[in-house]
Amino acid sequence: MPLPQVRATTILAVRRNGQVAIGGDGQVSVGDTVAKQRAVKVRTLKGGRVLAGFAGSVADALTLFEKFEEKLERYPGNLPRASVELAKEWRSDRVLRRLEAMLIVADVEHGFMLSGNGELIEPDDGILAIGSGGAYAQAAARALMRETQLPPRDIVEKALTIAGEICIYTNTNITVLEPTR
């Protein structure tokens, strides 16, 4: 009998007017059961200047965070280069290629979505979303960006709340981070 699928998360990052915020919900589901309600799937890196969040396997994501931190050390202050180098290694390394996670990384200048199949996307509108409720959070964030002057933190909170009201694999126990100055 196959193990039930672990479904975890909605992660959203928003950049606007020289500010950035990233957030994630707290739900982890195993099959059709909520296994955890207050998981934290976002963190700060590089002394608080870089924000990161993951969807997918926790162990795989932690491995990728370590690899990404190595890239940030090798290319200090250059989030685009560190992201490209991680995407290249993730895609070409036999072990890393099997990791089942997606990452969002962002600072005040750039934001990227990375995946193991070689995807490296920097959106035009400064909105990045991954995970089971990602499309709902992205749609809500786009509407809030177009129709309000809210700062990124508020957009992330409100959009993730909306996603949590729609997606059964997303809740409203939200963690939001901003870079430290």
From Swiss-Prot:
Gene3D superfamilies: Glutamine Phosphoribosylpyrophosphate, subunit 1, domain 1
Molecular function terms, GO-annotated: metal ion binding; threonine-type endopeptidase activity
Class of this enzyme: hydrolase
The reaction(s) this protein catalyses: ATP-dependent cleavage of peptide bonds with broad specificity
One Pfam entry name: Proteasome
A single cellular component GO annotation: proteasome core complex
NCBIfam families reported for this sequence: ATP_dep_HslV, PRK05456.1
Protein's recorded name: ATP-dependent protease subunit HslV
Assembly and interaction partners: A double ring-shaped homohexamer of HslV is capped on each side by a ring-shaped HslU homohexamer. The assembly of the HslU/HslV complex is dependent on binding of ATP.
Family (UniProt): Belongs to the peptidase T1B family. HslV subfamily.
SUPFAM superfamilies: N-terminal nucleophile aminohydrolases (Ntn hydrolases)
Keywords: Allosteric enzyme, Cytoplasm, Hydrolase, Metal-binding, Protease, Sodium, Threonine protease
UniProt-annotated location(s): Cytoplasm
EC number: 3.4.25.2
Function text: Protease subunit of a proteasome-like degradation complex believed to be a general protein degrading machinery.
Species this protein is from: Gemmatimonas aurantiaca (strain DSM 14586 / JCM 11422 / NBRC 100505 / T-27)
Regulation of its function: Allosterically activated by HslU binding.
Residues binding Na(+): G164, C167, T170
Keyword Zinc: no
CDD domains assigned to the protein according to its UniProt record, in alphabetical order: protease_HslV (cd01913)
Any GO BP annotation: proteolysis involved in protein catabolic process
Active site per the UniProt annotation: T9
